[in-house]
Amino acid sequence: MLLNDARQQITDACSHLSDDGLVVGTAGNLSVREGDLVAITPSGLPYQEMRPDLVAVVEYATGKQVEGPLKPASELDLHLTALRATGQMSVVHTHSYAATTVASLEGVSALPAVHYYICMFGGSDVRVADYAIYGSPELAANVAKALEGRTA
């Protein structure tokens, strides 16, 4: 099985995110890049049912699935775009109540940093990406724009 450690990390994180109420059901997704491959949560699988062997593996350059019985998350393009834009090795995309509420506020383009970790790892504020339909190239582009000059 490819990317055993990354798949286990994703499975463990899914359990924590679900237990902490940061995701509900199948909302949100996670990915971890190792070299030319990316492990990503599969589409439509509740986090409580996640197992390493169910995590999809795709090519970093193309997004083509190379392993896993289930198709990758519908936000695969968003993950690949964010990984490329930031140079980071993982993406955690939750649908927490707070994040969903903020994303729904019209006219809000950024939130002030309320914790020093935001400044250490992200920037002086938290940017809000412009709305676009889930899974669309437009949403991936909007996220990349919000991440310009940032690592998170």
What are these regions (language model features)?
Residues 1-152:
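Glycine-rich flexible loops
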